[in-house]
UniProtKB/Swiss-Prot annotation:
Protein species of origin: Nocardia uniformis subsp. tsuyamanensis
PANTHER family reported for this sequence: BLL1128 PROTEIN, UNNAMED PRODUCT-RELATED
Mutant lacking the gene: phenotype: Disruption mutant still produces nocardicin A at levels near that seen for wild-type strain.
Top-rank EC class of the record's enzyme: hydrolase
Signal peptide, first to last residue: 1-34
Gene from which this protein is expressed: nocK
Family: Belongs to the AB hydrolase superfamily.
Lineage, highest ranks first: Bacteria, Bacillati, Actinomycetota, Actinomycetes, Mycobacteriales
Name listed for the protein in its UniProt record: Putative esterase NocK
EC number(s) from the headed UniProt entry: 3.1.-.-
């Protein structure tokens, strides 16, 4: 266990899962900063990572002290030495609002996907079942940067304790966890080699989060999400289901979120793939849009699940379809996220 003090100017944006309701008007996205040329280090981080499968990974409960507060996480990794000389890749995993690290590990399918690629996973535990996905303080989260500090502390600890390669650290989040992952990516693109967000969007004004540099981002979102609409959420309707211990945070649309990261990374080469047909009448289908910067290798990918709800495609989360909507069973979010982050 290590102690970590507050760093000056620390404000990390992470993709975190959050619950909200349909029927909101889209909010105009904040202006993105002018793209900057990626550094040589950044270009290296955007190149594919060699996959080295492991068969002996186990999960252990760990703690780290951050600004005097003990925070918990679950580390899933091989106890042996990393197969790669520079260390093992690491992905921070952020559960949704009202969820837990244990639930995320049990139902996401990420352990199997990560083991097949040799990636260590750190399932972080949120405070009061949620995250500071927005830089705006709340009664439950008076310090909006506490979760940013937590993420940094876990990476710092595991860089030594688990032989993690600091140049290949990622974040994966669902719902409010997806929002937290996006916040981390936006505010600290130099900390991560990529993030994957499922059912997450960037916060909207007045507590907006703006991407500040190039970083690979994967967004997976259902266009029939009944909790946090695909077109964003300005205010939650009165009949929003109670999820977690705080009201949902306002966000911009999925398209605006993705576009903000494209612009920040100078990724203006566009490609769209046609929708995968639904497996059955009334089922879900997917389409994919990619923006890329061919000079750096950076990609921002948006997968839309047509007919999909506020769900983790391919997962086994025990959520009622009447509340969260339909779950796509053909797409494996776990495999897709790990493959994207490692440069597949």
């Amino acid at each position: 266990m290590i102690g970590v003090t507050r760093r000056s100017g620390l404000a990390l944006a992470v993709l975190v899962s959050s619950a909200a309701c349909a029927g909101a008007e889209p909010v105009a996205p904040p202006p993105a900063p002018a793209p900057t040329a990626p550094s040589a280090v950044a270009v290296e981080r955007f190149t594919p990572v060699e996959r080295r499968p492991v068969a002996d990974a186990t999960t252990t409960a760990r703690e780290v002290v951050v600004a005097g507060r003990t925070r918990a996480y679950r580390l899933h990794a091989s106890p042996g030495a990393p197969a790669l000389p520079e260390g093992r890749p690491l992905a921070l995993v952020l559960h949704g609002k009202g969820g837990s690290a244990e639930e995320m590990e049990r139902h996401s399918g990420l352990n199997a996907a990560a083991d097949a690629a040799g990636v260590a996973l750190a399932y972080l535990e949120g405070v009061a079942e949620g995250w500071s996905a927005s830089p705006e303080p709340t009664d439950l989260r008076p310090d909006p940067d506490a979760d940013v500090d937590f993420a940094r502390a876990v990476v710092d600890e595991l860089t030594g304790a688990a032989r993690v390669d600091p140049d290949h650290v990622y974040a994966i989040g669902f719902s409010e966890g997806g929002m937290m992952a996006l916040r981390l990516a936006a505010e600290h693109p130099d900390w991560f080699a990529g993030v994957a967000s499922v059912a997450g969007q960037l916060p909207s004004p007045p507590a907006e989060v703006r991407p500040t540099g190039p970083i690979p981002v994967l967004s997976i979102y259902g266009d029939a999400d009944p909790l946090r609409p695909f077109d964003g959420l300005s205010t939650a309707p009165a009949d929003t289901p109670a999820i977690g211990k705080e009201p949902p945070k306002p966000t911009i649309s999925t398209a605006e979120t993705v576009e903000a990261f494209c612009r920040a990374g100078g990724a203006d080469e566009r490609r769209r793939e046609e929708a995968r047909p639904a497996a059955a009448p009334g089922g879900t289908s997917t389409s994919r849009e990619t923006c890329a910067n061919p000079d750096s290798g950076l990609r921002v990918v948006s997968i839309t699940v047509h007919g999909g709800g506020h769900t983790w495609p391919g997962g086994t989360f025990p959520y009622r379809p009447a509340v969260v909507g339909a779950t796509d069973r053909q797409l494996s979010t776990a495999d897709t996220a790990v493959d994207f982050l490692l440069g597949g």
